[in-house]
């Protein structure tokens, strides 16, 4: 899709807009559910899609990934997913219906966290969305 727009003579802004609306959104579908379970290799693979899109958009002007991100006004996909998950966790926190999912910490200590993290016995439960979002809320004031 991006290659065809480039062949027809689309501008940089148009190609970035198409990338954001048609391609990037696919990598962010339901990310609060699966982001906590991503491995480092998964993160690299997802980031590679944006890297390839920027190489297509910029063509011979592409030098480094960070420079391409700045030029196109984009951020790392991992940062974007983190922000989306944080917004989702904050909306759960404010929700009358779903705030019961988060258990408040019973005792106050100097390093007390706002929410207690449930005990996990398996790696699958440890990377579940509820645990991930609770840790996310505790790490952000």
What are these regions (language model features)?
Residues 1-141:
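Hydrophobic/basic alpha-helical segments
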């Amino acid at each position: 899709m991006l290659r065809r727009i480039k062949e027809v003579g689309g501008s940089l802004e148009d190609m970035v807009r198409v990338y954001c609306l048609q391609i990037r959104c696919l990598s962010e579908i339901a990310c609060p559910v699966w982001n906590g379970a991503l491995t480092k290799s998964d993160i690299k693979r997802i980031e590679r899609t944006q890297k390839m899109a920027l190489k297509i958009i910029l063509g011979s002007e592409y030098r480094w990934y960070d420079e391409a991100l700045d030029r196109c006004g984009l951020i790392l996909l991992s940062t974007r997913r983190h922000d989306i998950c944080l917004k989702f966790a904050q909306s759960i926190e404010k929700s009358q219906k779903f705030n019961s999912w988060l258990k408040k910490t019973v005792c106050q200590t100097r390093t007390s966290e706002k929410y207690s993290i449930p005990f996990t016995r398996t790696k699958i439960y440890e990377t579940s969305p509820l645990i991930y979002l609770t840790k996310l809320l505790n790490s952000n004031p």
